[in-house]
Regions:
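Phosphate-handling catalytic cores of nucleic-acid transaction enzymes
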Residues: 1-212
Length: 212
């Protein structure tokens, strides 16, 4: 799939938010329509997964159960991925949440009129320990493995994610001067846009106020 990372840099009042909202709208609408159309199938698959989990828990509590019986149910459960409602566009997301969303959806679009969300990956909530691996690997679909002590490992075989952000110049300066972003090569993967201001020259299609 095509992956593009774009960053628009503009001063306040450049209508960054309306433009980002316009870009995001069809993705939100498509996900909504798809989820509505497949809602019953999703709920059915979720119920089947929970039933199989309950069967496995009940089987493990039996005294006369064999290892083969447990292994068979575990295999069946591992082959049945839990269904979730489709997500395409994500906004303010943490690295941990992004792993789960990519596991469920495979491909995503990170889109926001605030590039400050990239601070989530530079260590804002992890004691200044950066976590850019997933952003880098989802650019070309490289396998990503998330190991956590409190849960099973998550393996993303081919994660893909495009990034579409807009920010003010001071945020852009902080990104350029961030050694983590520069050293990782992340900022070199973006296409940058510096729009020319049209303040004072904008045309509106609103009806004129009639004279009294």
């Amino acid at each position: 799939p095509l992956v593009l990372d774009t960053l628009t840099i503009a001063e306040p009042s450049f209508k960054k938010s309306p433009v980002i909202s316009l870009i995001k709208r069809p993705y939100i609408q498509f996900a909504h329509d798809w989820n509505e159309h497949n809602k019953q199938d999703i709920f059915t698959a979720q119920a089947e997964y929970k039933l199989l989990e309950s069967k496995l828990e009940a089987l493990e509590k039996k005294k006369d159960v064999t290892a083969e019986e447990i292994a068979k149910l575990q295999t069946d459960l591992s082959n049945m991925s839990p269904s979730n409602f489709r997500r395409i566009a994500v906004d303010d997301v943490t690295p941990e949440s992004l792993v789960n969303l990519l596991e469920e959806n495979g491909t995503l679009l990170m889109i926001s009129d605030e590039s400050g969300m990239l601070g989530n990956f530079s260590g804002r909530y992890s004691n200044n320990i950066p976590n850019l691996d997933l952003l880098l690997k989802s650019w070309n679909g490289e396998t990503y493995i998330s190991d956590r002590a409190t849960r099973a490992s998550i393996v993303l075989k081919k994660p893909y994610m495009s990034i579409c952000l807009a920010c003010q110049p001071y945020m852009f300066d902080s990104m350029i001067n961030n050694p983590v972003f520069r050293g990782s090569g992340l900022i070199a993967r973006f296409l940058y846009c510096f729009p020319v201001s049209n303040i004072g020259y904008r045309k509106y299609d609103t009806q004129a106020v009639p004279e009294a």
